[in-house]
């Protein structure tokens, strides 16, 4: 209502007896600005802005705060308030949110400027959760901050590679939570535990040893016995590789003359053949190593949680291929037929497969696993490097062929008698050696034009190789740092789950997304949510005129049910990899209820005095779910 001072000023201005009053205009504008202002207290930090600023992004949590009539607010699934009112004490209302105050400054600045930037001092998952709570899509992040925002996703994907059983290539490190997850999965797949009850209790005693044997040969950090087995396996691997190398040395080879007598009818023919045999001691050592590898392979394939995954693993295929030739050679050594000798000759050639056992060291050394992950992650860079080299080889091989023909003598019709570059395919070898800066010296240009092409080829090779290499080095550094951090991470058996908020406790409502989904729930942990989430009524006539804010989630009806069993490691990794849009497609609603509101049985909210107190319940500690 316009004050009396303003009315008299307006009449005086109309009659011409009194000039217009600027004080009146300033006073009315100040009153309008005061009613338009809103105060948002986030984690103890007060932010002041206009309601019109919050309305710039409709459908978000702050936009619902700025709408006192509830026109743009969706109704709650749980029968919550359909309309609301905000109490005013002559000034702007203040609403409290127990969220991160630093991130909210960037969120509020997004409402003001329309540009969402990512803070550099906040972890990526925390910023993602805050965006989910305030109802802002992650795709609104500015391009300049998108790489910073995506860094935590890349780190989580790299950690998932180390946690996966087939991607890690071996057991988990000390203090590694992924090892506990894998052992838990193994127990679930292999059947009941020993001493279990129920129909499967009889088979549980038989199969209870399988998880222990699997951990004994697969996870070197599961027990002291597993470490002994790991050292024994490492010892036999090194001995087998050493034996393989010594077999090719002349000092361990024995020449033997073999006499063969062939009789065809009445004709007898004698043939002398020379054979080279390996020192028997090396054969015995190799036999002992193969017996250990056979025992290890059989135990692992019998006790593995998933036989199909075991068969598809590359390291297990290498184990089988390296063991098989030894037994075939022993079985065919007593035969003297020509076919048997041919097979033995082939098996001796196939002995080089034993050198592939060196890859089994990846189960015991983190650096080798990191190298394997780096090679797989840098596939695009390697492909780009090959394409660059192929283009350079084709171009410079053609150029060197024609450049060398410039110095040909007139008596040379082909023009290639004075040079080694007889054709373009020969120039491919020279171009590869030159671009990789090896320079064997077997082929080199002899004319001034060929030398110029050779110099250009060497410079192009240096620049071509230097471009993709830093990306590969960065990938290795990222994987190695993550692996080292994962090993130094303290062991976490069970994560702490806080008690659920009680109806009369001063705990504020939170969205479903802030619940510890990734926690490992113990059997004694209480349900995460037994009743609706409650926000305490904030009554402060000096600050906000007795304003009350009650947070509600549109999907709160489903949250009133007790939580199910603890999520599996695969589910936790899937939740970690999911984005903001997948985690929460509908942002939680925030309804404003004044102290005089009554929640009725039909779901409506009516003012004090308009309904009978018996028909409705006062809204003081009620969450609109």
Curated annotation (Swiss-Prot):
Q: Which residues carry this modification: Phosphoserine?
A: 8-9, 15, 21
Q: Tell me what this protein is called.
A: Voltage-gated potassium channel KCNC4
> What is its membrane topology?
Multi-pass membrane protein
Residue positions annotated to bind Zn(2+) are 117, 123, 144-145
Superkingdom of the source? Eukaryota
Q: Which residues are glycosylated?
A: 257, 266
Which SUPFAM superfamilies is this protein grouped with?
Answer: POZ domain, Voltage-gated potassium channels
Where in this protein does the record put region Disordered? 1-24, 65-86, 490-581
**CDD domains xrefs:** BTB_KCNC2_4
Specify residue ranges for compositional bias: Basic and acidic residues: 528-543
Q: Which of UniProt's keywords are assigned here? A: Glycoprotein, Ion channel, Ion transport, Membrane, Metal-binding, Phosphoprotein, Potassium, Potassium channel, Potassium transport, Transmembrane, Transmembrane helix, Transport, Voltage-gated channel, Zinc
A cellular-component GO term for this protein: dendrite
Q: Its Gene Ontology molecular function terms?
A: delayed rectifier potassium channel activity; metal ion binding; voltage-gated monoatomic ion channel activity involved in regulation of postsynaptic membrane potential; voltage-gated monoatomic ion channel activity involved in regulation of presynaptic membrane potential; voltage-gated potassium channel activity
The record's Gene3D superfamilies line, in alphabetical order, gives: 1.10.287.70, Potassium Channel Kv1.1, Chain A, Voltage-gated potassium channels. Chain C
Main localization (coarse): membrane
The UniProt entry, under InterPro entries, shows:
BTB/POZ_dom, Ion_trans_dom, K_chnl_volt-dep_Kv, K_chnl_volt-dep_Kv3, K_chnl_volt-dep_Kv3.4, Shal-type_N, SKP1/BTB/POZ_sf, T1-type_BTB
* Position of sequence motif Selectivity filter: 437-442
Where does the sequence pass through the membrane?
Answer: 228-248, 279-299, 314-334, 346-365, 382-402, 453-473
| Gene behind the chain | Kcnc4
Residue positions binding K(+): 437-440
Q: What is known of its domains?
A: The cytoplasmic N-terminus mediates N-type inactivation.
The post-translation modification note in this UniProt entry reads: Phosphorylation of serine residues in the inactivation gate inhibits rapid channel closure.
Taken from the record, one Pfam family name reads Shal-type
- Provide the family line: Belongs to the potassium channel family. C (Shaw) (TC 1.A.1.2) subfamily. Kv3.4/KCNC4 sub-subfamily.
State the taxonomy lineage.
Answer: Eukaryota, Metazoa, Chordata, Craniata, Vertebrata
Q: What is said about its interaction partners and assembly?
A: Homotetramer. Heterotetramer of potassium channel proteins.
> Which SMART domains does the entry mention?
BTB
Q: Which reaction does it catalyse?
A: K(+)(in) = K(+)(out)
